[in-house]
Amino acid sequence: MKKKTKIKLSIAFLCCVTLLTFMCVGAKAETRETWISDDAYSYCYEIGNQYNICPELLMAVIEKESSGKSNATNGGCVGLMQVSARWHKDRMLRLGATDLYCERDNILVAADYLSELFQKYKEPSLVLDIYNGNSNAMRNYECGVISDYAGDILDRTAELERLHGK
């Protein structure tokens, strides 16, 4: 191979490595803070404090359940935290929450449910699995198994807490 060709290939290789490095660093930086709306972020703090639930946990659930999209729907569950009006009709009435597509109402209903689960079960991974409708939640907990769902949320919660200086 000619010397000029080797130099060109070396430069091209270094450019690719540099580009990939910047892309990876940029991707990591992008995941450091939450991408939920400013209003949802504020509601997580307001409602989290009201229910004594870590606001970062609420943010992590929102990211996992809906990627921060208040109009998300899946199998009868709607909104940021994927709440089912069918299962939480009484809770919604009690809380005065009328629209699960409304960020505040959705977070309020979900936080109320999570608070109930935390009072009953205490263990975050178990609470998250039950919240997610995992029929094996109790068995997983008793066997010391943390689901990917719960693990992802707990990891993201810890990351957000670090970013927020906790």
Question: Predicted segment positions?
Answer:
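Extracytoplasmic
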Residues: 53-56, 75-78, 122
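Structural recognition of the beta-strand scaffold that forms the well-ordered cores
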Residues: 60, 80-82, 127-130
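Conserved alpha-helical segments that form or flank metal/cofactor-binding pockets of metalloenzymes
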Residues: 62-77
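Non-catalytic cell-wall polysaccharide-engagement segments
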Residues: 2-43, 47-51, 69, 86-166
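Short amphipathic alpha-helical segments
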Residues: 41-42, 55-59
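Glycine-rich, phosphate-binding/catalytic loops in enzymes
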Residues: 77-80, 147-149
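Solvent-exposed, flexible loop/coil residues
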Residues: 74-76, 84-87
